[in-house]
Amino acid sequence: MSDKGSRGEREDKSGAAIRDALRQIQAAVCDYKIVPDERPMIAAELRRMAKHADVVLTTGGTGVGPRDVTPEATRDVIEKELPGFAEAMRMESYKVTPRAIISRAMAGIHGKTLIVNLPGSPKAVAECLAVVLPAIPHTVELIRGEVVECARPTESNQ
């Protein structure tokens, strides 16, 4: 989410970082759009993308600036919040910078789609994706109803 990016005044390096990370794990990037920092426009775009995607990743607009409204737009759209995603991102990011506590990023479910807000800087995007990417496949399976039993027996708990 970026006013300047949506007007073509700034290169979207964070969006590129997301696409690069997804390509490295052979995930398909089926859509990409830069949306201005306008709550109704962000919410509409999240709903549109959720119609054909398992996961929607946003970048930017998660701070405390006057135009940072991505979490509010996400909250308008989701039916279930998944606070663990944002908590894990903030926890790991705090190890890098105390400014991580300013993040208002969130995650949740809209229909059968996982929506995750990522920070706006390419470096923070890479750090946060390293935290959440391992949990995304299982989360998507759960959202789709493909997992009937979460606990798999191991030798130690049989």
Residue spans for each PLM region:
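Non-catalytic beta/alpha edge segments that cap or flank active sites
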Residues: 1-158
